[in-house]
Amino acid sequence: MAAITAALIKQVREDTGAGMLDVKKALTEAEGDVARAKEIIRAKGIAAAGKREGRKAQEGTIASKVVETANGETGYAVELNSETDFVANGQDFIAMVQEILDQAVENRCKTIDEVKTLKLANGDDAVTAVQQRSGITGEKMEIDGYNFLEGDNLYVYDHMNRHMLATIVRLSESNEDAGHKVAMQVAAMKPIALDEASVPQSVKDEELKVAIEKTKEEQVEKAVVNAIKKAGVNPNLVDSEDHIESNIKKGWLTPEDAEKAREIRAKVGAEKAANLPEQMVQNIAKGRLNKFFKESCLVDQEFQFGDGDKLNVAQWLQAQSKTLAVCDYRRYSLSAE
């Protein structure tokens, strides 16, 4: 059995990142054999990681970069999660996500599955390496996200340099200032699509359905409120059964007026709902849908980083250059939004 010296412990610690006590135990079990000790640490780390599968890893780090390629540029973003920001802010954790990003760039990965099978410097694939690290930190860790964007004139933004929110935008022409500001716009305003045409039809259909229902409810409620007012009852006192009961107890509403309001709500509400002009409902609903597009589509959003002019993103870009436009974007955030 080889002597377990301080130098030997230091070597294994540096190679594995494991704690001193774990290294000493592994070396003792391996009778001083460094290779066996590393394998013991590795196996224990993976086993421990498996026990944490049910736990949530909501903290972490997003590493991102734009690189020059033969065909232009490519922007990459990799997300590695942990359970606490203490682990996520550790040098070893940051080094690991950076290594995964570098390998993704080198291998031009296009999917998260490709990223997970990447071979890292220690010879393990990325998932196995993360599992080993999880065993050392005592926290669940996982590669939870990956994105890339190809094309010329790419700009990446790391919000507040905290590696928790990253965006990549592609412009029609080179403009560093515009690229940075549009990338900040994406971070701040959370667009769901580039433009109206890019919004999935299923989303459009659902938003229109919601807008129609809301419009009908508002029109019916408006008719009911007007009828209750004409009957001499304060509509604010009878807007729900809870309020009616409460206001009767307080003496603010008589039982007779309460019953009158109930009858009006039932009768007028049913009549109005049955006779709503369909075209009017459609017009109002489409107006709501257009508002949704203006708030949710990047090019139509009000630009947040201009000089106070009420311009949308597309208009602001054209004010910088007639041929300047945003062509695509990616947004990645650790938090559920």
PLM regions: where:
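N-terminal assembly/interaction segments in proteins that build large macromolecular machines
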Residues: 2-337
